[in-house]
Amino acid sequence: MTTYTRKVSAMRAAVHDTFGGPEVLRIEDRPIPTPSPREVLVRVVAASVNSADSRIRGRRFPRGFGGVAPLMFGVRLPRIPVLGGSFSGVVEAVGADVTGVAPGNVVAGTTGMAMGAHAEFVAVRADRVVSVPEGVSHDDAAGVIFGGLTALWFLRDRAEVQLGRSVLVVGASGAVGTMAVQLARLAGASVTGVCSAANADLVRSLGAERVIDHRAVDVTTLPDRFDVVLDAVGVLDRHTGRRLLTPDGVLLLAVASLADTVLARGNVKAGSGPERASDLAHLLDLVAKGEVRVVLDDVLPLDRIAEAHARVDSGRKVGSLIVRP
């Protein structure tokens, strides 16, 4: 483990200055960011490590995005040295133009493309954070964000899931999948989950009426037809997914190739949704009321960031994975 002497006015952060495996990550001192007039400075208590962090670090993107993504994340060297897009913590300071948020407030939020949450402090726009309800832990608040926002946008906004609909969730034990199963169930849908046999009981406990072992059954050959199919892991494309739909069904591709993203039309929905503070507040309220459960694979100190990335890379992560600075 790397050791170093702490600098005044510095923070610990997980940094990568080259692309590669989890081993490229290290902990180093970085300047504590100064919030702009419309930003807040948050002392991070918990941050999630998810597939977005893994893809950027390893420069591994869905098919077709290899020529586009480097323009955002760096061609030869990383453009974003500190990853992490979802966090929970305590407001340390606010910019001159910020109202409604004060030092000491417990908040959760997103960073957008700027990332930076895998550190002791992060500066973000004030409209990107919301209050964490009493009784919701920092780990749960950070853990609900990535999967919850994705699942909510696809199921509620893109497919309009409602009572009596049949929903298939592929990748039902991951961060997106565990939230999708629960949100679909809350909407009154009948849920079928696809995951490994080891996670079948978990997925059932979240509300799936039926669970399919992806190692035993090729999901693309299922004889069943569903009103909504949400692929959270990139198993399906617009052709194989459509075969699983009822005549008026909707296919949701959370991990889509460039071609599927560009050519998504009609009953095929792909792409990434907005990170709306109102949606995050809604999800946190559901957690506070006990209506959804945040599944946590592990909670690790920031010093073990490489281990966290390796777990994400393995494809065996269950729910969300949290690091604490």
Task: Give the positions of each predicted feature.
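Short glycine-centered segments of the SAM/dcSAM-binding site in methyltransferase folds
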Residues: V106, S166, S190, G249-V250, ...
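A structural motif shared across PLP-dependent enzymes of the aminotransferase-like
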Residues: M113-A126
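C-terminal hydrophobic helical "lid"/dimerization subdomain
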Residues: Y4-S9, L280-P325
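Mid-domain Rossmann-like dinucleotide-binding core that forms the NAD(H)/NADP(H) cofactor-binding site
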Residues: A102-P103, A142-D213
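Glycine-rich beta-strand-centered segment in the early N-terminal region that forms part
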Residues: P31-S48, P62-M113
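A short acidic, Gly/Pro-enriched loop at the edge of an enzyme's catalytic core
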Residues: T221-V228
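Glycine-rich phosphate-binding loop and adjacent beta-alpha segment
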Residues: A232-V292, R324-P325
